[in-house]
Amino acid sequence: MGIYDHAFHFAGGGQRYVAELAQILQDRYDITYIVNKDISLEKYREWFDIDLSKCKLKIIKIPFFEERGIYIIDECMIIHQDENPFDVIKNESINYDIFINANMLTKVRPLSSLSAFICHFPDKDRGKFFNVERYDYVITNSSYTTHWLKQKWGLDCTLRLYPPVNMFNDTSDLGEKDKMILSVARFETGGSKKQLEMIDTFLDLCKKDKRLKKEWKLILAGGTPKVNPYYDKVKQRAKRVSNIEIRANLNNYEIKQLYSKASIFWHACGLNEIDPRLIEHFGMTTVEAMQNYCVPVVIDGGGQREIVEHGISGFRFTSKEELKSYTLKLINDDYLREKMAKNAYNRSKKFTKEEFEKIALEFFSDIENRLRGGEPMEVNS
């Protein structure tokens, strides 16, 4: 099996998703990770606590990007080329029984016996050298992504495989929760995770309810590069009240501690957006919070609709006014908050690593069957 990830040298959600899959399959297949930049498999143990020690690594540098000193492999840069620079990966793919395109590089044509394209979201238009329709299987991470796969590329999904989420914490206890609202999301330079809007909402709540201002706090946690004007703006606005805390670049243990203490979880990515690319395609941090008895109050859009059952395991909002209303409802009703926290915890079990592994192994058993000349079985989609 060959797994190609042109962005393997970045610590992102897409990389983690496929690395989790590789970790499951490495005992079953001879796996080679195909990458374009210098990196070691050991990095994934450091970044994600994922052991890929049974996989091999093959670095194939693409001359088009190397000659220009480009670190980020961006397929949009090659549209004016007469020949496809990614043909070097196409030629490599013939060496494998199964070839997996792990991170949506649409311009790689597969030549393996069987092939799978993993689509986290179809954010690019069809264009020159587009080859996704040549893959035997297309895997998506949510029904939301599946819908837009059909809308944008006219392609059907073979398998919907929700990301594996494993943030269960023995220290999380409903009886030990703080009066804390938590959000965990990257501080994107363009502000797509809506931290400023969440601060403004919390400031409005503090003005409306003096008890809330005195007893509750908002913590915004997430990663940020060293130079990030948006993050600077978030920090500045948070200074308006003393009960807003900004926590950047925390490690996994520190994030777990926040989840274990938080009572309510906010996720606002997609607020006031109409571009489907800017709405959360799944929402792993929402599930992480639910696994720690945090009641989610999240945007009513994208993959969040598949995670949170409105009024049962949390609330979904469409405006800042609704975000305030649902939050106050939870703050002022301890019984409701505890009931929803239990429901959220139970709901989160749908998105566990065990469920991911079960569905993935069933799917690859089907692929093995096809390689041996058998009829393909029906898979979950």
Stretches found by the model and what they are:
Residues 222, 231-256:
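Nucleotide-activated donor-binding/catalytic signature segment of Leloir-type glycosyltransferases, i.e.
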Residues 139, 172-193, 199-206, 219:
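Conserved donor-binding/catalytic core segment of Leloir-type glycosyltransferases
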Residues 329, 336-350, 358-362:
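A short, well-ordered alpha-helix in the C-terminal region of glycosyltransferases
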Residues 124, 134-171:
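Donor nucleotide-sugar binding/catalytic pocket of nucleotide-sugar-dependent glycosyltransferases
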